[in-house]
Amino acid sequence: MSTRRLPALLLPLALLAGCQNNQTLKEIGNAPAMSPIGSGLQFSQTPQMGMYPKQPKHMASGYSLWSDSQGALFKDLRALNIGDILTVNIQINDKADFDNETERNRTNASGLNWKAKAQILGWTPDADSSIKYGSDTDTQAKGKTKRSEKLTLLVAAVVTGILENGNLIISGSQEVRVNHEIRILNVGGIVRPQDVDAQNIISYERIAEARISYGGRGRLTEVQQPPVGQQVVDLFSPL
């Protein structure tokens, strides 16, 4: 590679490293901007969602006061339509401890013997050969994983879609800015209207396809992350 092309190849990498963490020029010296209201409402229906069977419609007969939005006679109205709001109770307290150990031994030995004898014009040559070969492998592996996670909070979510079978698609976000750091919480998934309690609250373990994200952005996050240029070098470095 020509030495003249090297600066041209390094220039885009340098520009990329200077724009790490999507920091804009407006945020230099200022607190990071918060997202507009409503930007956290995400709804992207996959083809698999359209395969659910349609929910049969329950028509009130006579003077019936039954309503599917309640699901019980003595409960308050719960979120059922697009745009309704419900509260998600997140209480994650997970612990995992794995200790795996593997040992593998293998020994293989083989041999080959052959003998040849012939008579040519009164001369009898004799050939004898022996070949032996073998292999021996030994593999030992040990792995251990230990982690503990705890997250407790309440967040409001909005019904952004309704599946054919009546299940609700919810999406919600919450942003809290303290000084120059923003903490961002995103939650989304599919819930059954029957799982929403009388207080219009649903627990996180009853959310199917749950996507819960708790992170942040700001000055502290930028310092903790390595530069983009270093990440690219670490990704493609053979050593």
From Swiss-Prot:
The superkingdom listed in its UniProt entry is Bacteria
Q: Which UniProt keywords apply?
A: Bacterial flagellum, Cell outer membrane, Lipoprotein, Membrane, Palmitate, Signal
Q: How does it sit in the membrane?
A: Lipid-anchor
User: What are the recorded GO MF terms, alphabetically?
Assistant: cytoskeletal motor activity
Write out the GO biological process terms: bacterial-type flagellum-dependent cell motility
Residues carrying the lipid (S-diacylglycerol cysteine) are: 19
Signal peptide limits = 1-18
Annotated lipid attachment (N-palmitoyl cysteine): 19
What family does this chain come from, according to its entry?
Belongs to the FlgH family.
Which PANTHER family does this entry report, sorted A to Z?
FLAGELLAR L-RING PROTEIN (PTHR34933:SF1)
Query: Partners and quaternary state?
Result: The basal body constitutes a major portion of the flagellar organelle and consists of four rings (L,P,S, and M) mounted on a central rod.
Q: What does this protein do?
A: Assembles around the rod to form the L-ring and probably protects the motor/basal body from shearing forces during rotation.
Name of this chain's protein:
Flagellar L-ring protein
Organism of origin: Agrobacterium fabrum (strain C58 / ATCC 33970) (Agrobacterium tumefaciens (strain C58))
